[in-house]
Amino acid sequence: MERIKELRNLMSQSRTREILTKTTVDHMAIIKKYTSGRQEKNPSLRMKWMMAMKYPITADKRITEMVPERNEQGQTLWSKMSDAGSDRVMVSPLAVTWWNRNGPMTSTVHYPKVYKTYFEKVERLKHGTFGPVHFRNQVKIRRRVDINPGHADLSAKEAQDVIMEVVFPNEVGARILTSESQLTITKEKKEELQDCKISPLMVAYMLERELVRKTRFLPVAGGTSSVYIEVLHLTQGTCWEQMYTPGGEVRNDDVDQSLIIAARNIVRRAAVSADPLASLLEMCHSTQIGGTRMVDILRQNPTEEQAVDICKAAMGLRISSSFSFGGFTFKRTSGSSIKREEELLTGNLQTLKIRVHEGYEEFTMVGKRATAILRKATRRLVQLIVSGRDEQSVAEAIIVAMVFSQEDCMIKAVRGDLNFVNRANQRLNPMHQLLRHFQKDAKVLFQNWGIEHIDNVMGMIGVLPDMTPSTEMSMRGIRVSKMGVDEYSSTERVVVSIDRFLRVRDQRGNVLLSPEEVSETQGTEKLTITYSSSMMWEINGPESVLVNTYQWIIRNWETVKIQWSQNPTMLYNKMEFEPFQSLIPKAIRGQYSGFVRTLFQQMRDVLGTFDTTQIIKLLPFAAAPPKQSRMQFSSLTVNVRGSGMRILVRGNSPVFNYNKTTKRLTILGKDAGTLIEDPDEGTSGVESAVLRGFLILGKEDRRYGPALSINELSNLAKGEKANVLIGQGDVVLVMKRKRDSSILTDSQTATKRIRMAIN
């Protein structure tokens, strides 16, 4: 207040104003400060000062011919003064207004295309709904969020090449457009932006917004998808929040969401197969999300989620160095530890072999609904500061931290035996055994933990074993805070290794991720996920397995048929028949398999008993390890639609219906496709008709390699010999004729020779 009075006093003296306004500033330091470098030192002041002048803007001389000297109100729009140091004229802001209202119109067709992200944002806001404002304490935590809705996921380098190719196609410089998405986008944009008059620099800038994911590390309390982040300033303040539902979705959020669902499904499925890592890779490579290959999305998309990171690790990509436990992401912020195997006794006197971390360490824990800071020493929790959305979330974080601390009182709180198993029926490792046990019921754990008196610290409060807050007492070392803990901000990625059982380790051998950490939450994907791998057939239930298995046989009939006659064991062991086994009652799988294999062998031995329909129908039943028995079956049971349904060995049934005339297969009333066979297969003169131009030499001769199908014969050179599979599943040796003249006689002799060769 005193200072202000003093200044007022000074200003009232006549000389002061004169000195301040007229005197030159000649102190070198000040001149240097404000004139060195191109960077404006005080932009807002500069702007205000400029706009206070009459003609703060410069324009091209042509403006004087296109804009009148005065507007309708008689205000001057431009000055006859030239701009010092350029041949431009000085213009009033009013000239801009005049130009916007009365200036020439150009084609606006390219605007929505170039400024696509802005137009779409306006649409989303127009159709969005803003709800009531609530005043409450906001627990915000900084998270890395996507601030740019509606973008593709190109890397900066890929985008740069696309932009150069679209905007400056004639510029020199090597540009390599390799990825599918780069080529598609380039083609699309070149067509859209033909004859575009908008400045190339602007187009380039807008394209960048469309192609590259931009992330910022921002304090967020609610939704983190990009359509929520674009209105962050409208939906949450320090002490208020406004409910908001976006008026539209954007593909990048949908890709992130669908990628997580696909990755979870794949990891869960791979974990229960014989070779999890190989299965996982097979599935990632054969899956598409919204029409894009999943492996391409994984390479470009920075989403960090347990299942997604396991898939990335399997592909040899780098991932974040934080590790996951109990659904929380742990990041060590200080300290270090060494690991030692120890045997510990639970309260039930069960022995657990645990890798104990020896040493003092501090971690941040970030989960979906709670965050915490954890300080621990060897098998001792020193301090845990938690904040969460509600009591339940806080409790979850406390349980995870208590188990992670490996404290004795936690191990002694175990009641009953620990025998949790994963989806593949393998026992979980001891740390996850403990976690599951206490997640089911933490009462004893909290009761046995111990409580202490607490000091009154701003923003912190105690929590009792029954999860009620208290200002006097708290569970030992544990406090609840109003402030959230920020997510780990670094985008650094590290090289990791993955073992056969999908455990991901960093280069020091610490386990960062394992299938146990993959969430069981089921969601509905926003984009269509197409799993081409047979391993994922069961994701839509038993009927889908049934239909997919038979469709696979029909689609691959040519190769299946050859294998059936030449190498049946290899055919029976195909992974495509694996899902089908779960439909056959366990007790009888072996007998069915033995029965079908014997039946097939008879077909191979006895001429003329080859039956396409029957082979297709019974093939999946031959996949289980066979039990030798004398049992005969007239029908085979499969468990679909909640009960056992029968497939007849001879003839059609509601489950399997094959129409011989149309060659259409119907499974449970659903169309399962049409069998495309060799022409005329199954008619009597097949062999003679098809083998015109070939000489039949006799029985199959293994030296000439595996049997070809009739369609493949055309590739033979004249005089070349080959084994060929003919209509009834029999194999004969043929030679392509050297002369074409004798083709006619082949038809008659072929039939006789085949009979002889086979018999």
Curated annotation (Swiss-Prot):
The record marks 627 as: Mammalian adaptation. The keyword Kinase does not apply. A motif (Nuclear localization signal) lies at residues 736-739. InterPro entries: Flu_PB2_2nd, Flu_PB2_6th, Flu_PB2_C, Flu_PB2_CAP-bd, Flu_PB2_middle, Flu_PB2_N, INV_PB2, PB2_helical. One of its GO terms (biological process) is symbiont-mediated suppression of host cytoplasmic pattern recognition receptor signaling pathway via inhibition of MAVS activity. It is found in: Virion; Host nucleus; Host mitochondrion. Plays an essential role in transcription initiation and cap-stealing mechanism, in which cellular capped pre-mRNAs are used to generate primers for viral transcription. Recognizes and binds the 7-methylguanosine-containing cap of the target pre-RNA which is subsequently cleaved after 10-13 nucleotides by the viral protein PA. Plays a role in the initiation of the viral genome replication and modulates the activity of the ribonucleoprotein (RNP) complex. Belongs to the influenza viruses PB2 family. Influenza RNA polymerase is composed of three subunits: PB1, PB2 and PA. Interacts (via N-terminus) with PB1 (via C-terminus). Interacts with nucleoprotein NP (via N-terminus). Interacts (via N-terminus) with host MAVS (via N-terminus); this interaction inhibits host innate immune response. HAMAP family: INV_PB2 (MF_04062). This is Polymerase basic protein 2. It comes from Influenza A virus (strain A/Hong Kong/1/1968 H3N2).
